[in-house]
Amino acid sequence: MIENLQPLRGMKDLLPNDYQIHNYIINKARDVGALYGYKQMSTPILEYTKVFNRSMGESSDVMSKEIYSFVDKSNNAVALRPEFTSGIIRSFISNGLQHKLPLKFFSTGPVFRYDRPQAGRQRQFHQLNYEYLGAKGAITDAETVKLAVDILKALEIEEDTTLELNSLGCHESRIVYQQKLVEYLNDFKDQLSGESRLRLNKNPMRILDSKSEIDQKIIAHAPILSEYHTNESKKYFDELQKYLDILGIKYSVNPRLVRGLDYYCHTVFEFTTKKLGSQSTILAGGRYDMLSRIMGNYDVHAIGFAAGIERIALMREYKISVIKPVFVLPIGKNNICYALDIVDKLRLQNIVSIIDPIGKIAKRIQRVLNEDAKFIIFIGDEEKMNNNLKFKDLKNQKEYIIDFEKVLELLKQ
């Protein structure tokens, strides 16, 4: 026997009750996305590491500290996906979908990051992911935010979230701002946290995300990104806000909200909550017009977002209605074949049915009661001989000796 046989740290089993909640969340989100024209697709969990290196940059936190990567038996550098977007764009390029724009993709599944496990943050977790490729103009940003709002409403958590948004401006204005930010932060270099000092030359905009109290005091007086926007960028953000106002979407502009990856531009947004402590982000997204250029030399306007399923599940207690199975208990080996035939007929009628032929009848009945079932069908010698069934309603404790057609009537009431 292997001692202490447990899952890896930060990775959890999804038992049936958890899976029911996950499936409920996924199905709700998928249905809302379908109303917007999103079609489900899937990419491999494992990709060449260069897919993420190229998209996220080797100096990003994900690639430098959080990526699960290794060399396989064919000497290929591969990685477990830390997010969906890079794989979706890789798929878009490798499948030659450039001439089929616009495209709207929904994906879901596990992602992996080597992070410090805590409530709402695991090393393997699951996401809902939406990508809109060929999304031109602020109107598509507004529609994407509205989709996110509608998903949170369908999941009954929208009222417990706050929407924050910001504009990163165009690529040119971002470069100018980054230079100004570095100039400002260099004056406080010795006071910054160790992590922020490392980011200063590699990815300075990520410092704006720092949770360090020392960093926060310095950041509070840093240059504001919007002060370096071009007129075109200002017009774009104004137009987005106009559309959101028309749609009746409540939001606040957070000038410190950024993305540390170079391919982001213009709109970024987050839905946060106060119900989950430090892990406050429920859903986050933004526009990434530069990514397809970085990965494949294509210019594709795009916007998307992702939401953590585990965090959504922590937001409220979802009560999932579960179809109770009918248990069929044959009494004696001679009646097992007849019981199998009855179970098969029930399943053909889309009735969830379980046969339990082994063990003492008292123990089998107890197993049924433990499952909180509603009905039992007993099949003994007399029932088999008369082509009947003993049907017991566990709610009112009534028993009936009836034929199969009458059983169907009672089950379908």
Curated annotation (Swiss-Prot):
Catalyses which reaction(s): tRNA(His) + L-histidine + ATP = L-histidyl-tRNA(His) + AMP + diphosphate + H(+)
InterPro entries: aa-tRNA-synth_II, aa-tRNA-synth_II/BPL/LPL, Anticodon-bd, Anticodon-bd_dom_sf, His-tRNA-ligase, HisRS-like_core, HisRS/HisZ, HisRS_anticodon
The keyword Cytoplasm is annotated on this UniProt entry: yes
Gene Ontology molecular function: ATP binding; histidine-tRNA ligase activity
A single Gene Ontology CC term: cytoplasm
Keyword Oxidoreductase: no
Key words of the record: Aminoacyl-tRNA synthetase, ATP-binding, Cytoplasm, Ligase, Nucleotide-binding, Protein biosynthesis
Subcellular location: Cytoplasm
GO biological process, one term: histidyl-tRNA aminoacylation
Taxonomic superkingdom: Bacteria
Family classification: Belongs to the class-II aminoacyl-tRNA synthetase family.
Subunit and interaction comment: Homodimer.
Protein name: Histidine--tRNA ligase
